């Protein structure tokens, strides 16, 4: 599948992103880590070696790979991605984020058409916003997850983020004070910006239990994550679990993964 890059009209957001890219090129952000630099180097090598159009698609993780540790994209990465598009390579972001939480540096990048989000549980057309496929957690499994964790929720030891049709929802007490639920200070601004608060998250989950792309359990005490993970997977065979950070346990349908999400495109 070949996509020719078309320039998108600039908005104030695009202008701001462009300025950030220019600053990054002149004065590299000190948070740009070795992992991101290695990614840039490997991406440029792949494009350079793409003789005869052998490479048709590049699937990209986002956080701490395509994006730097502060969530921004370097000028070098942006240039490499645009070069890939111009060389007829389909660029496909694949992320644990929900669709509505994708950064503007990705959504406004010309030439990107499809994105696999919620750890591959959903695939969206980035241009139209239409969901073109995916998996939702079985309603019986949603209820089982709540039954196994709701007591801890009532005690303030865990809380939930749920992704419904590309949008992240969370309990209003958590959105107001993420740090009280184990979220590090560096992630507070992102959490408040992208999570839509509801008064009663458990009732919200039950109301939408047939629509959940993902349930993320946020852990006040990260040391219990592995034990909880094992207990959930043992009791509920219809789910898939993963974790990108120590305070978060991400749950999707058992068939959902970044690889399976890519298979829908």
Which residues does each predicted region cover?
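Conserved acidic, metal-coordinating active-site core of Asp-based
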Residues: 156-265
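Mg2+-dependent phosphoryl-transfer enzymes with acidic/Ser/Thr/Gly-rich catalytic loops
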Residues: 2, 40-57, 73-74, 234, ...
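Short helix N-cap motif at coil->helix boundaries in the Bergerat
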Residues: 68-69
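Active-site phosphate-binding/coordination module
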Residues: 75-185
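Non-catalytic pre-domain segments flanking phosphatase-related domains
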Residues: 1-60
């Amino acid at each position: 599948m070949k996509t020719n890059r078309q320039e998108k009209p600039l908005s104030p957001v695009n202008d701001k992103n462009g300025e950030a890219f220019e600053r990054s090129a002149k004065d590299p952000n000190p948070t740009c880590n070795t992992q991101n630099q290695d990614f840039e180097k490997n991406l440029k090598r792949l494009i350079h070696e793409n003789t005869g159009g052998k490479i048709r698609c590049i699937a990209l993780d986002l956080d701490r790979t395509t994006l730097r540790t502060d969530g921004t994209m370097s000028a070098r990465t942006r240039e490499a991605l645009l070069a890939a598009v111009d060389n007829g390579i389909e660029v496909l972001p694949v992320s644990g984020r929900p669709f509505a939480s994708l950064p503007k540096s990705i959504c406004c990048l010309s030439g990107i058409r499809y994105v696999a989000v919620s750890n591959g549980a959903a695939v969206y057309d980035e241009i139209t916003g239409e969901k073109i496929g995916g998996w939702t957690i079985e309603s019986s499994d949603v209820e089982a997850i709540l039954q196994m964790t709701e007591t801890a929720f009532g005690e303030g030891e865990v809380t939930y983020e749920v992704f419904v049709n590309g949008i992240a929802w969370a309990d209003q007490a958590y959105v107001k004070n993420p740090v009280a639920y184990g979220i590090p200070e560096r992630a507070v601004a992102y959490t408040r910006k992208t999570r839509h608060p509801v008064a009663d998250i458990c009732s919200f989950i039950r109301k939408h239990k047939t629509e959940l792309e993902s349930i993320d359990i946020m852990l006040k005490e990260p040391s219990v994550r592995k034990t909880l993970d094992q207990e959930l997977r043992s009791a509920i065979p219809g789910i898939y679990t993963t974790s990108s950070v120590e305070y978060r346990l991400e749950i999707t349908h058992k068939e959902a993964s970044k690889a399976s999400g890519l298979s829908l495109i």
